[in-house]
Amino acid sequence: MKKTIFQQLFLSVCALTVALPCSAQSPETSGKEFTLEQLMPGGKEFYNFYPEYVVGLQWMGDNYVFIEGDDLVFNKANGKSAQTTRFSAADLNALMPEGCKFQTTDAFPSFRTLDAGRGLVVLFTQGGLVGFDMLARKVTYLFDTNEETASLDFSPVGDRVAYVRNHNLYIARGGKLGEGMSRAIAVTIDGTETLVYGQAVHQREFGIEKGTFWSPKGSCLAFYRMDQSMVKPTPIVDYHPLEAESKPLYYPMAGTPSHHVTVGIYHLATGKTVYLQTGEPKEKFLTNLSWSPDENILYVAEVNRAQNECKVNAYDAETGRFVRTLFVETDKHYVEPLHPLTFLPGSNNQFIWQSRRDGWNHLYLYDTTGRLIRQVTKGEWEVTNFAGFDPKGTRLYFESTEASPLERHFYCIDIKGGKTKDLTPESGMHRTQLSPDGSAIIDIFQSPTVPRKVTVTNIGKGSHTLLEAKNPDTGYAMPEIRTGTIMAADGQTPLYYKLTMPLHFDPAKKYPVIVYVYGGPHAQLVTKTWRSSVGGWDIYMAQKGYAVFTVDSRGSANRGAAFEQVIHRRLGQTEMADQMCGVDFLKSQSWVDADRIGVHGWSYGGFMTTNLMLTHGDVFKVGVAGGPVIDWNRYEIMYGERYFDAPQENPEGYDAANLLKRAGDLKGRLMLIHGAIDPVVVWQHSLLFLDACVKARTYPDYYVYPSHEHNVMGPDRVHLYETITRYFTDHL
């Protein structure tokens, strides 16, 4: 087959690709070998080989709480030591009214803190929720729940909970002890399958994780209302009953009508509900809701259907009327607001906004007239988590990639601007929780050689180590893990990779290699975490004599807007070119058997796997594609149109990425795997690809998990990866 001009240019660039100096974790070749039950989440022994962690660790004011054995532990963060108070399940049982005692177990009930100042937690028990005041040592109220109760959202005070049942929204007030449960208030009564309240909307894109939003004092509840009646339903079939049952999934596909979302505000004092007057067009995205501290204004980041414009609008909470547009952000590719406004402590008119307007996600200080006061953080790195403020409200705390795209560190900076200060300088990945008053942090740290270390730090006063996890791999054979960089297909962008070498590696021998790929937005597979972010299956395959290689190609996360947006309107092209540069690097290694290269990925990685098998069948002998996007016309609007635009606007891009049209190009062994009730990449994708292959007289293999959605989770995940392993060992 003749090579196109693009392929010739691509091969020329990759021929120049060299790996920059790499680092390696030394192998431990003696010891036992792992099983999948030990390496895979859901496996019977997985948690025996998972780094130790502190269960339920979270802040309560300047105290932190967690579960240890059968006890709830309550610690005062005061520098280099900890003042500890313990409550056992037995202690709590003694405080409970008759008939509400905890079951006798070795594990303490799960919980969450509610009100930072009052020591209030909610304990999740069978049949209900228990409000417990740790400082007063008493049970304060009870909430009755059942399996139909969903989307629980507690008020800031903690005495009320909003929830969804049968598509309607309710608010319940906890009953006092001895008085039974109070009756719930129905905020809405007309909910149906096509009209839903209080749930996450817009396919959970734009950072949307829930559908209810309490005002700061708990006086009002804002909520989403989603009308799906204009969306053609996709059937999701449950095959377990004697007669299979079909349930509709209202899944708006690219280029088709989208659902209509509005925002309501329920006022508890009057029982009145008003809806924001967001106007026309109705097909837009209402994202990142946030309240003003005085509860008078609700702010909404409104994104147009084309997703190239974001307006931050203010609405009157009493009437729902539009007040003003604070500012507008546009981008020639796409905008993607992910975070609501965060007001400065004690201020009703100044807030922090996160934006990629300069090419990197940074923090900006605004006032409520829409005036930009200043850009607070700046540089060719990404703020990955805005944590909050110091007690005086003069400094910001955040996590970022300033040290390296592979790391996260916790920084502070003066709100007036200036140099950032790294408060967690140890090289690796720091996941932090700032205390509500901004005086202390919980730092959960990992590095390639540190399984997990948990430290509580009073900022400027000292630290207390809560946990230093032991190496869970002790006594087991571990392969060498190499990390480094290669050059992208553009010849100028470094890409990070990880390479798990075969166990008992002999440089004089030849070994097969499996490329594990994702390649799409919002994912980063190579980081400086435990085992250099190498997963359990990589180690399992190394035991069987395979190398496993992963490179984060352009389009993946945390490298800035230009790095990600290069894929816009042409998904699968730039990412594939970069992945092939990774293959070129592998082929340059004397120990790689170039005739035995495989590829595996899931979701976007399933799309990439199938694409690579169809495009480079002369390179990849075997592929396993899980939950693959096959035709982007059949993917949902919010994600698909952001990166592709609408099919009517970019028919060439959709056509180039439509793998149905290339089913006849399949040469190697390809197995597709799909969950039969997948609501993310609907089953239709891989089924239609099979149909196209039948017509083209090509012969993929296929495996279905009837009881699983987009990912195969729980104990069946071990079965999944045994299936994948067998496919590679049989054919590669």
Swiss-Prot record:
Functional description taken from the UniProt entry: Serine proteinase. Releases tripeptides from the free amino terminus of proteins. Has a requirement for Pro in the P1 position, but is inactivated by Pro in the P1' position.
Gene Ontology BP, a term: proteolysis
Pfam families on file: DPPIV_N, Peptidase_S9
PANTHER family: DIPEPTIDYL PEPTIDASE 9, PROTEASE FAMILY S9B,C DIPEPTIDYL-PEPTIDASE IV-RELATED
Keywords in alphabetical order: Aminopeptidase, Hydrolase, Protease, Serine protease, Signal
InterPro entries: AB_hydrolase_fold (IPR029058), Peptidase_S9_cat (IPR001375), Peptidase_S9B_N (IPR002469), Serine_Prot_S9B/DPPIV (IPR050278)
Molecular-function GO terms, alphabetical: aminopeptidase activity; dipeptidyl-peptidase activity; serine-type peptidase activity
Swiss-Prot/TrEMBL catalytic activity: Hydrolysis of Xaa-Xaa-Pro-|-Yaa- releasing the N-terminal tripeptide of a peptide with Pro as the third residue (position P1) and where Yaa is not proline
Active site residues of this protein: 603 (charge relay system), 678 (charge relay system), 710 (charge relay system)
Modes of activity regulation: Strongly inhibited by diisopropyl fluorophosphate and Pefabloc. Weakly inhibited by 3,4-dichloroisocumarin. Not inhibited by phenylmethylsulfonyl fluoride, leupeptin, antipain or prolinal. Activated by iodoacetamide.
Temperature and activity: Stable for at least 12 hours at 25 or 37 degrees Celsius (at pH 7.6).
pH-dependent activity: Optimum pH is 6-8.
Family as reported in the entry's similarity comment: Belongs to the peptidase S9B family.
Protein source organism: Porphyromonas gingivalis (strain ATCC BAA-308 / W83)
Post-translational modification: The N-terminus is blocked.
Signal peptide feature range: 1-24
Enzyme Commission designation: 3.4.14.12
Name assigned to this protein: Prolyl tripeptidyl peptidase
